[in-house]
Swiss-Prot record:
In B.subtilis, unlike the situation in E.coli, the role of FtsA in the recruitment of other division proteins to the division site appears to be an indirect one, through ensuring that FtsZ forms a proper ring. Homodimer. Interacts with FtsZ. It is a peripheral membrane protein. Residues 396-440 are annotated as: Disordered. The keyword Membrane applies. It comes from the Bacteria. Belongs to the FtsA/MreB family. This is Cell division protein FtsA. Cell division protein that is required for the assembly of the Z ring. May serve as a membrane anchor for the Z ring. Binds and hydrolyzes ATP. Also involved in sporulation. GO terms for biological process: cell division; FtsZ-dependent cytokinesis; sporulation resulting in formation of a cellular spore.
């Protein structure tokens, strides 16, 4: 079995906390484990209870660990767009080696030089994202390692965030027993996975409609230029349904997930469902169209605020259109309504990997892909190998399965003789069970 590098991403959202385990083979990502649990301790994207957030993180990791069959102790952590600032930066260093071949250490030094800027006391540097490297005046270089030169420059994007919010996030992750290998801005990571090169060059807005908030990320000329966070999301839709149908939040959430439709004109009059009237045992019947009337109003409001925010940023033309992602983007009718409200090209982006083909996983997948690419350029190690005991256990399980299969073939070929017991026929290896759980 190949022992490739493994990477784990942690996406802490208002509604759900998600862990994704990926295996990188060259530039190809293979998802081997997922944890997804309801979040506790967050409101509108911000941590309001440390202990509850730690508990949610631990539960998500436990779920992912059961799928992969070994402990997970490291993760790439996503930071949402709340209280984030973006600015241009640059750094310059002299190439240090005698033969003037640019080494990993030179790339590290120039990235550190780009961080030597004055930031407000209440802000911390989250990351520097290189736009291009310049070697002796030659620009548009994506990876300068092994090139010859005397002077190495980098032009990049400096990302800073609220010191308090970042400290709270990192404290929660560390208290959950997880070592942080990298920190990435979520809109940037999601954009790296959801958007095409052409879209980012032309100008595109990535709209991540989450549970507690909606994040706008604008990409122009190939790079992230600005982000905004709107404190409205799926939880507001659930609350509206609860009020409109006079039912509990739990029932409203069920209606939203199972029968929700965001576009009244496309919703069904024939699709009928029942909910319990809150405070009574009485049932009341509604159609999908009646629920859509409630949902459409809130989603339309969110999209109109998105338009207003873009205008306030001075963005009036986006030839690349809009790309929707996040958990609420999967709801039927959202794309049709967005096309009406935004008056532009709109599509919904989902990861194209087995087990995570849903817009809610776009950020988690993007965190792995984005962090891997940046770490490779800067010569940083953020992955880890599968534990030796786990490899041996899988190898033993695989060997036992092959032996069992061979023995079954022998038994089938015998005209007479003692047959295998039912228990032996039902025996499954650990990996087989793991795979069957994953494919469900």
């Amino acid at each position: 079995m190949n022992n490739n590098e493994l990477y784990v991403s942690l996406d802490i959202g208002t509604s759900n906390t998600k862990v994704i385990v990926g295996e990188m083979t060259d530039d190809s990502l293979n998802i081997i484990g997922v944890g997804n649990v309801p979040s506790e301790g967050l409101k509108k994207g911000s941590i309001v209870d440390i202990d509850e957030t730690v508990h949610s993180i631990r539960k998500a990791f436990d779920q992912a660990e059961r799928m992969v069959g070994f402990p997970l102790r490291k993760a790439i952590v996503g930071v949402n767009g709340n209280y984030i600032n973006i600015q241009d930066t640059n750094g310059v260093v002299a190439v240090s080696s005698e033969n003037k071949e640019i080494q990993v250490e030179d790339v590290r030094r120039v990235m550190e030089a780009a961080q030597v800027v004055s930031v407000p006391h209440e802000q911390l540097i989250v990351d520097v994202i290189p736009k291009q490297f310049i070697v002796d005046g030659r620009d548009e270089i994506t990876d300068p390692k092994k090139m010859l030169g005397v002077r190495l420059e980098v032009e990049g994007t400096l990302i800073t965030g609220s010191k308090t919010i970042l400290h709270n996030l990192l404290r929660c992750v560390e208290r959950a027993g997880i070592e942080i290998t990298d920190i990435c801005l979520q809109p940037l990571a999601a954009g790296s996975a959801a958007l095409s090169k052409d879209e980012k060059n032309l100008g595109v807005a990535l709209i991540d409609i989450g549970g507690g908030s909606t994040t706008i990320a604008v990409f122009q000329n190939g790079h992230l230029t600005s982000t905004r966070v709107i404190p409205l999301g799926g939880e507001n839709i659930t609350k509206d349904i609860s009020i409109g149908l006079r039912t509990s939040t739990e029932e409203a959430e069920r209606v939203k997930k199972q029968l929700g439709h965001a576009y009244y004109d496309e919703a069904s009059e024939d699709e009928i469902f029942e909910v319990t009237v809150i405070g009574t045992n009485q049932k009341q019947t509604f159609t999908q169209q009646e629920a859509a009337n409630i949902i459409e109003a809130r989603v339309e409001e969110i999209l109109e605020i998105v338009s207003e925010e873009l205008r306030s940023m001075g963005i009036t033309d986006l030839p690349g259109g809009f790309v929707l992602t996040g958990g609420q983007a999967a709801m039927p009718g959202v794309m049709s309504l967005a096309q009406d409200v935004l008056q532009n090209n709109v599509r919904v982006a989902s990861p194209n990997y087995i087990g995570v083909r849903d817009p809610q996983y776009m950020t988690g997948v993007g965190l792995i892909q984005f962090a891997c690419r940046n770490a490779r350029i800067q010569g940083r190690k953020i992955g880890f190998k599968m534990p030796e005991e786990a490899i041996q256990e899988i190898a033993v399980s695989s060997s036992e399965e092959q032996e069992q299969h061979h023995h079954q073939n022998e038994v089938q070929q015998r005209p007479k003789g003692k047959q295998k017991t039912q228990a032996e026929h039902n025996k499954q290896s650990k990996m087989k069970k793991l795979l069957s759980m994953f494919w469900e």
